[in-house]
Structure formats: structure tokens, C-alpha cells
Swiss-Prot record:
Name of the molecule in the record: ATP synthase gamma chain
Keyword Cell inner membrane included in the entry's annotation: yes
Family: Belongs to the ATPase gamma chain family.
Superkingdom per UniProt: Bacteria
Membrane topology: Peripheral membrane protein
High-level lineage: Bacteria, Pseudomonadati, Pseudomonadota, Betaproteobacteria, Burkholderiales
Gene: atpG
Organism: Paraburkholderia phytofirmans (strain DSM 17436 / LMG 22146 / PsJN)
Subunit structure: F-type ATPases have 2 components, CF(1) - the catalytic core - and CF(0) - the membrane proton channel. CF(1) has five subunits: alpha(3), beta(3), gamma(1), delta(1), epsilon(1). CF(0) has three main subunits: a, b and c.
GO terms under cellular component: plasma membrane; proton-transporting ATP synthase complex
Compartment annotation: Cell inner membrane
Keyword annotations of the record: ATP synthesis, Cell inner membrane, Cell membrane, CF(1), Hydrogen ion transport, Ion transport, Membrane, Transport
Listed HAMAP family: ATP_synth_gamma_bact
GO MF term list: ATP binding; proton-transporting ATP synthase activity, rotational mechanism
GO biological process, one term: proton motive force-driven plasma membrane ATP synthesis
């Protein structure tokens, strides 16, 4: 009976665990939908800023913003690493950290040192374990990231590039593909290339360049501000995609945990039933044996 009592305890324990993972799955599903909405809402802003900046760059070809000038001579490279603050989201963080480590080795092979910015506690811990130089970080963004919280950490990287201290700035995050698929990506954030400003309309034509703005105070000041806002929007978009990926990965991970818990419960229930059947059979045998002896 002690064995049966122990099995009942295990079944109860796994059932309680399954209740927790099921609840976490439902919470993650709800947060995932909101994260996807934020991700989609961020895209039009970045697209519009890009279109305006592209038009102004074409209208004022004599001016080149520092973000569009190459710093090949710099001995360092910057990277903004976007991860989650929490775990229990499958291999999502592991994948983007592995990709980042490969990028670090590639840059170090080119003789570059790393100037890193961490967004998320998992990435910050990873960089600290590597003893990498962390020039800025922001953690505990919560479920609703605000651009104001990101600007300070991102500005450090933008200033490093503007001052010619880094040859390029890379952005590492997890791109949201769909609910079941998220992929780690590392994109070059700076210098900005002309290709980034080329966006085709739905009919395949490029946006019209026949009109112009009235600039206040002047075109250069507006371009300077626009390009900073554009880069900030790209980082915010990456953070929004990373959060949508996090909730999707967590929902899938918790569903898998719930399914596995159900399988374990069924197996334990089968063992319990067999033990109970064996105990009953033994008692019956003892009763029959006692009756025969009398």
C-alpha cells in the first residue's frame, strides 16, 4: 500500500504542475495576440519615416548624414542584442545567443573589438559571462515596451557610430514568422544603405519624387532628426517582434509541457491500477488460502 500511496502522490504532483503549465499557456496566448498587434502597428510608422527620409535624401544629394557614411577604419563594432527578460520560452534565447556568438567570433577574426548593448536580462547575463564590453543596457521592459525606455541605451550606439568609433552597428533579435516559427536574425543597422530607402509601391513603381517639403528650420536639421527616429523605429520594431516571438515560443513550450504532463499522468495511472490489482489479487489469494487451511 505504501507503493500505491507514493504513486498517488506523484499523480497529484504532476496534475498540479499541468494546471500551472496550462494556465501559463493561456496567458501566453493572450499576450501573444497583443504583442502581434503592437508589432504590426509599429511597421507603418517606420515605413513612413523611411519614405520621407528617402525623398529628402534624393532632394538633397549634396548632404550625407553620418549614419550613411562608412567607418571602415574603426577598430570596434557595435551590436544591439535583444533577448527576453524571462525564460520558459523554448530555445528562442539560446538560438539568438548562439547566432550572436558566431557574429562575435567573425568580427574578432577581422580584428574588431565588440561594443555591446543588451536589451533584456538574458542577453545581459550572456554578455557578462563572455566578459564582453557592455556600453549600455535596458532590462525589465515588461509586456508593453515603450520607446522612451529604449532611446537611452540605443543612443549610446548611435553616438559611437556618429563619432567614428565603431565600423558598424548590428541588431540581433528573434524575428516573428508565425506562431510555430521564430528565427534568429542579425541585421546591419548602421551604416544605412541606399537600398533600405528604396520601397516599391503595390504596382511596382517607386514613390513619386516630383513633390517636395517646406523645411523648417532647414533640410539638413530635418534629415538629421528623421534618420535618428528611423533607426530608433527599427530597434523598436525588433523589440516588438522579439516580444511576439517570446509569447509564441512560451505558448508552444507550455502546451508541450501540458501534453507531456498528461502522458505522464496516464502512465502513472496505469502503474497505479496494476499495483492496486496486484494488491487485491494478493489479498484474495490469502483469503482463499486461509479458507482452504480451515
Amino acid at each position: 500500500m505504501a507503493g500505491m500511496k507514493e504513486i498517488r502522490g506523484k499523480i497529484k504532483s504532476v496534475q498540479n504542475t499541468r494546471k500551472i503549465t496550462k494556465a501559463m499557456e493561456m496567458v501566453a496566448a493572450s499576450k501573444m495576440r497583443r504583442a502581434q498587434e503592437r508589432m504590426r502597428a509599429a511597421r507603418p510608422y517606420a515605413d513612413k519615416v523611411r519614405d520621407i527620409a528617402a525623398h529628402m535624401s534624393r532632394a538633397n544629394p549634396e548632404y550625407r548624414h553620418p549614419f550613411m557614411v562608412s567607418n571602415e577604419g574603426a577598430k570596434a563594432a557595435g551590436i544591439i542584442l535583444v533577448t527576453t527578460d524571462k525564460g520558459l520560452c523554448g530555445g528562442m534565447n539560446t538560438n539568438v545567443l548562439r547566432a550572436s556568438l558566431q557574429k562575435f567570433k567573425e568580427l574578432e577574426g577581422q580584428g574588431k573589438t565588440i561594443e555591446a548593448t543588451a536589451i533584456g536580462t538574458k542577453g545581459l547575463g550572456f554578455l557578462n559571462r563572455l566578459r564582453a564590453k557592455v556600453v549600455s543596457n535596458v532590462v525589465h521592459l515588461g509586456d508593453t515596451p515603450h520607446l522612451e525606455k529604449l532611446i537611452g541605451a540605443v543612443k549610446v550606439q548611435l553616438d559611437l557610430y556618429s563619432e567614428g568609433k565603431v565600423s558598424a552597428v548590428y541588431l540581433a533579435y528573434t524575428r516573428f514568422v508565425n506562431t510555430m516559427k521564430q528565427e534568429p536574425v542579425i541585421e546591419q543597422l548602421l551604416p544605412l544603405s541606399a537600398d533600405q530607402f528604396e520601397r516599391k509601391e503595390e504596382d511596382g513603381a517607386t514613390p513619386s519624387t516630383q513633390w517636395d517639403y517646406i523645411y523648417e528650420p532647414d533640410a539638413q536639421a530635418v534629415v538629421d532628426e528623421l534618420l535618428v527616429r528611423y533607426v530608433e523605429a527599427l530597434v523598436y520594431q525588433a523589440v516588438a517582434e522579439n516580444m511576439a516571438s517570446e509569447q509564441s515560443a512560451r505558448m508552444v513550450a507550455m502546451k508541450a509541457a501540458s501534453d507531456n504532463a498528461k502522458t505522464v499522468i496516464n502512465e502513472l495511472q496505469l502503474v497505479y491500477n496494476k499495483s492496486r490489482q496486484a494488491a487485491i489479487t494478493k489479498e484474495l489469494s490469502e483469503i482463499v488460502g486461509g479458507a482452504a487451511a480451515v
